[in-house]
Amino acid sequence: MSPNSTLWQTILQDLEKLYNEETYNELFLPVTSTFKDQNGLLTMVVANEFLKNRINKLYIAKINELATKYSSTPVRLKFVSQEEVIEEPVADRKLTIDYRQGNLNSTYTFDSFVVGKSNMFAFRMAMKVADQPGAVANPFYIFGDVGLGKTHLMQAIGNYILDNDVEKRILYVKADNFIEDFVSLLSRNKNKTEEFNAKYKDIDVILVDDIQIMANASKTQMEFFKLFDYLYLNNKQIVITSDKPASQLTNIMPRLTTRFEAGLSVDIQIPELEHRISILKRKTATLDANLEVSEDILTFIASQFAANIREMEGALIRLISYAQTFNLEITMNVVEEALGAVLKTKKKTNDLNENNYDKIQSIVADYFQVSLPDLIGKKRHAKFTLPRHIAMYLIKLKYNIPYKTIGSLFNDRDHSTVLSACEKVERDMRMDSNLKFAVDSIVKKIDSPLLK
């Protein structure tokens, strides 16, 4: 064990005594590596921005106090996320993967995943996959919008498998990191392809996050296609996440999307209010806050962040940190002080503003990758009629203006055409989960404060 690791292990022993089990397990244990520069700065690598920010905001002073206590030389600690780590030049490093740890965040478990109606099916199938890797659903494809728990559920599969079979070789990799590994190796030495393949193939379970990022990376897609087929034919478990159903992936080669669809696809939907409140209660219990957050406050926060659980949890952490810093009881006034800049009170207006209609049309066109003139125009190919009908439906849903007025926004279509389109979308959503997911995703984009 290196001196840096020894120092961190010593600090960990004190942290375990100072903080509760949840805080210790969630924040301090997941540190994956350490390295020290010539100026005595010891950089600690954690899995993501969330962990980095919490430690640096709330605990860094105590950690550096302990470092000074136990180090024989001047030293201070800094926490960074995995994405910030500057790697050694590719030519100087070996392509190695720690399969025992699998790049997994140990806090992402089935026990810490809050289950509700919106994710129940995905959760139960994930448990079956983890219990019988390679046998139940392969590939296992999880889709849903940003911040709804796809990564948590995917890594819970990996952690469960490792807990029950330490010999299993597991790898969690984000699609962009897979691309970077492949491109950087080839840019230095084209003969490294075999080494790349050998390392990625020597696993039992692969967890690939955000597969949609591979869009347009044709060479990487081809390499991933070869890897996919090899693992699949050898009964290795493949788990994939994406922000949309496989059938709606764009600029991904069809031979890949058809393989994704051949397994089991499950979606995680936007959780209902009661579910979001349960998530906040669980999060509050893990924060070691010693502060009471009332049901009314939790309900308010949950109502403001319907579409992104990470943002919702971030708001709760900000609120509790603010109250702790100023030694305040958490009231609605404190909520407004702490979260005012985050919330920016979104006032929804029903003004008949043509720009709002344009925005819906543009977002729908962008989502389905068709041009705005084709969306509004008279082309009858399904590629254009489906997004056109959805745009009509959403304008009616958001503004409840007359069908004739909506028709005027789509090349002067008549009342009955728009009425029929809206009824068809509403009817089809009840039977087609992929369509419902697409509409829900577009609604989220329309409501995003970044697009207002």
UniProtKB/Swiss-Prot annotation:
Region (Domain II): 73-102
Keywords: ATP-binding, Cytoplasm, DNA replication, DNA-binding, Lipid-binding, Nucleotide-binding
Protein name as annotated: Chromosomal replication initiator protein DnaA
Record gene name: dnaA
Annotated ATP binding sites: G147, G149, K150, T151
Localisation: Cytoplasm
HAMAP family the UniProt entry points to: DnaA_bact
InterPro entries: AAA+_ATPase, Chromosome_initiator_DnaA, Chromosome_initiator_DnaA-like, Chromosome_initiator_DnaA_CS, DnaA_C, DnaA_dom, DnaA_N_dom, DnaA_N_sf
Membership in a protein family: Belongs to the DnaA family.
GO MF terms held by the record: ATP binding; ATP hydrolysis activity; DNA replication origin binding; lipid binding
Region (Domain I, interacts with DnaA modulators): 1-73
Function: Plays an essential role in the initiation and regulation of chromosomal replication. ATP-DnaA binds to the origin of replication (oriC) to initiate formation of the DNA replication initiation complex once per cell cycle. Binds the DnaA box (a 9 base pair repeat at the origin) and separates the double-stranded (ds)DNA. Forms a right-handed helical filament on oriC DNA; dsDNA binds to the exterior of the filament while single-stranded (ss)DNA is stabiized in the filament's interior.
